[in-house]
Amino acid sequence: MAFKYHKVAIVGKHYKKEVSQMVETLYAYLQQQGLEIIIENDTAADTSLVNVAIASLKEIALRCDVAIVVGGDGNFLKASRLLALYSNIPVIGINKGKLGFLTTLAADDNALKNDLYAILKGDSSVTKMSMLKYRVDNNLRAPLEASIALNEIAITASRGLMFGLKVFIDGRYAFDQRGDGLIVSTPTGSTAHAMSAGGPILNPNQNSVVLVPICSHSLNSRPLVISDESVIDIYITDYNDPESVLSIDGRHDTILKAHQKVTIQKARKKVTVLHTKDYNYYDTLREKLGWSKVLF
């Protein structure tokens, strides 16, 4: 059976020795399979490899059939989100970090080679991860790479004071909130910051978005799951003379003032992730997050 993916990119976490060693091992293995390999610029610079083809993330997205991302979940988030902005290139995650919730292939040498071989032959399962985009006060000038989130868009207090939000969904008034902020999360992000704030876990294939209050000053404030086709308008009120911060996937902070409006909706692009054929999302929930474990 011929390989389905012939031009393979490797993207690793910068300045991490164990990742660089894994990249070198991967390169040798893929070369043995007769595949064409391109390594991301910074990733290649961290290795001892010479005379290898290198490229930026944008070039990789446009030139390669598949990208292998080596590192932790944070590195996977950053790389896969940027790759998806430029093409529909599928991504494979190899865990060399701590949790490994998104990077689902273990770095064990023999098992990894077998798993990679099967996936590159096309014997895999696929998850399509939706993303969110935002704009402030209808300003469309923000750089694309700084306005798209794979996990969540969060509006939080920049100082130790609660602040107020007024939320509209599809042009209809939904609720007011005073507290430490609000998280608007994708299904992928529902197991990250949103879960820590008390939000529900959403299946990655669910066409939903969840709004999760952060430390709301109310006994009846609860997370809200809505269609990912909805448009969310969030207004910063003047309560407590606020200065709040908008962040995407924990990065690219934007300072917000009273009366500014943040509009959030589903992005056109999705991240395509390849797993082994027997991948089970619920296994990952149990093994990585201790979900639904019997205590006695």
UniProtKB/Swiss-Prot annotation:
Catalytic function, reaction form: NAD(+) + ATP = ADP + NADP(+) + H(+)
Any idea which residues are catalytic in this one?
73 (proton acceptor)
Query: Where, by residue number, does NAD(+) bind?
Result: 73-74, 78, 151-152, 178, 180, 191-196
Q: Which GO terms describe its biological process?
A: NAD metabolic process; NADP biosynthetic process
Q: Name one GO cellular component term.
A: cytoplasm
Where this protein primarily resides, as one coarse class?
Answer: cytoplasm
Where is it localised? Answer: Cytoplasm
| InterPro entries recorded | ATP-NAD_kinase_N (IPR017438), ATP-NAD_kinase_PpnK-typ_C (IPR017437), NAD/diacylglycerol_kinase_sf (IPR016064), NADK (IPR002504)
Cofactor(s) needed by this chain = a divalent metal cation
Does Oxidoreductase show up as a keyword for this record?
Answer: no
Broad class of enzyme this protein falls into? transferase
Q: Which Gene3D superfamilies match?
A: Probable inorganic polyphosphate/atp-NAD kinase, domain 1 (3.40.50.10330), Probable inorganic polyphosphate/atp-NAD kinase, domain 2 (2.60.200.30)
Q: Which GO terms describe its molecular function?
A: ATP binding; metal ion binding; NAD binding; NAD+ kinase activity
In its keyword annotation, does this UniProt entry include Lipoprotein? no
Enzyme Commission no: 2.7.1.23
- Keyword annotations: ATP-binding, Cytoplasm, Kinase, NAD, NADP, Nucleotide-binding, Transferase
Q: What does this protein do?
A: Involved in the regulation of the intracellular balance of NAD and NADP, and is a key enzyme in the biosynthesis of NADP. Catalyzes specifically the phosphorylation on 2'-hydroxyl of the adenosine moiety of NAD to yield NADP.
To which protein family does this belong?
Belongs to the NAD kinase family.
Protein known as: NAD kinase
Q: Source species, please?
A: Francisella tularensis subsp. tularensis (strain WY96-3418)
Upper classification of the source organism reads: Bacteria, Pseudomonadati, Pseudomonadota, Gammaproteobacteria, Thiotrichales
